[in-house]
Amino acid sequence: CMFSLKTGRTIPVYLVDEEIYAKCPTVIISTVDKFARLPWSERVGLLFGRTDRYCSRCGHIAIGEKHAGRHNADVAAGLEKAETVACKQFYPPELIIQDELHLITGPLGTIYGGYETVVEEMCCIEKNGKKIRPKYIVSTATIRNAGEQIKFLYGRNEFAQFPPSGFDTRDSFFIKEVPLPTENLVDASEEKISRMISDGKKPFRQYAGICASGQSVKTTLIRLYSIILQTALDIAKDPEYEDYIDPYYTLIGYFNSIRELGGAVRLLDDDIASRIRVVKNKYNSSEQRYLSFEGKKEITSRIPSWEIAQVLEKLAISYDKNKKKQGCYDVVIATNMIAVGMDVDRLGLMSVVGQPKQNSEYIQATSRVGRQHPGIIFTVYNPYRPRDLSNYENFVGFHSQMYRYVEGTTATPFAARARDRVLHALVVSLLRLQVETMADNGGASNINDISDEQIKDIKDKILERVKITAPSSYVDTEKEMDEFINTWKNIAKDEKLYYFVPTIADDKKRLLTYYGEYYGDKEKPTLSSMRDVEQSSTVFYWEGV
């Protein structure tokens, strides 16, 4: 390998933002959360090839970025002298691949769609008087009204779908409906069963609905978990089936909220363990299943990311009947974090408590099991919730054609409240990344020095997207941009203005401030992340004396 240690070279993979900017890599893997950094730094332009200088010590320098022409040697730090030389710009990204499109919806999709205006504009190139835009490839397994979603997010009225709609619902290219074998497989040879599995003739996932009228969901959950866990151990002790129990020895519990999951944590520590003893005595099992502390884990937002990675890695550990190595998990409970990214082929058993808010979430979550081996999902419905009861009554019909019930996704990038959050950020981003004198942090003061044509060009690029995605908001969008730019010009007339300074000083005024921080009348709160785009409110209850 050309990157082996013998050659003294390392793999050219960079993780820190500043390193990525300096190297201008060919391939960038990122989350959409990074879009929020567009108005905050001129160095973001390096991701789009906007460089005009190269420093042998610091890497590529962004257009408009202030940088020393040379660096003296630093013997103590082991650094040689370095010079900055001129270089050509790179082409911007030509291909953008977006995975899990169905997740970019609601508030996140609305904010994302706004910033996508800047991303696409920065990826465009002019050739022979023609504007060449980047190509998008987006993937999703569960989406409806994809054309509308693509128009709102990417401003494209036309798109090609692969695979296209077929002639037979039993074959959609990625999924084929295979009838279950009619012959008795109990006495079938192991060779025959293996051949059927290799041919793909096996059931994929089986769904079972449970709705216990007159009982609480917690009671149902206690009884379901205890019988599943104890039965798995009983089967594991049977010599005839001990080699096939692995996919069903670890139970994945799926919950719709942290509150519901928190109740299940307490049940696992107490009630379920006690109920397992009852089940063992009732069915005269040879051995009781005990749930150790290490055998119970959760995958939620309240668990550190490094610990989640360890849990996912250990989930791949198979059941060891001889117990000569570290055992697999007994129960792993989770929220919708596992709906994306948990790819463990050995899993085959899941319990879902309550119908998720979106059917696409239900499909994505339950598809975590039954990948390599036949899977079974137990869905526990709350009889006191009308929606759960309705889904239970239509259980067979719904599960026979789940993809027909996927809801359409929504995104409104230029709605009134969305404009409050991102419209000014789009203006700042395009000015900093496309006008050289506006790029530097102190360039915010130069708003009065650039021509009206340059400002109009920036506005037109945003309004062009508004025409496609939200034509009814065109007038309001133009008016609000004019108001923001006029306010910006008035502030810059009186004093030196910066885009952002970490702390408010008497001699430094800033145009932007972090969203959620204290800000003055002349500062514009701006998102620095899209991880929490919905602002929370604190409610106080006061009782008078």
Residues of each region from the PLM?
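The feature captures the C-terminal accessory region of ATP-dependent helicases
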Residues: 390-408, 425-545
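SF2 helicase catalytic motif II
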Residues: 25, 33, 47-69, 87-125
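Conserved helicase ATPase core of P-loop NTP-dependent helicases/translocases
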Residues: 303-334
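Conserved helicase ATPase motor motifs in RecA-like P-loop NTPase domains
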Residues: 100-110, 119-151, 164-165
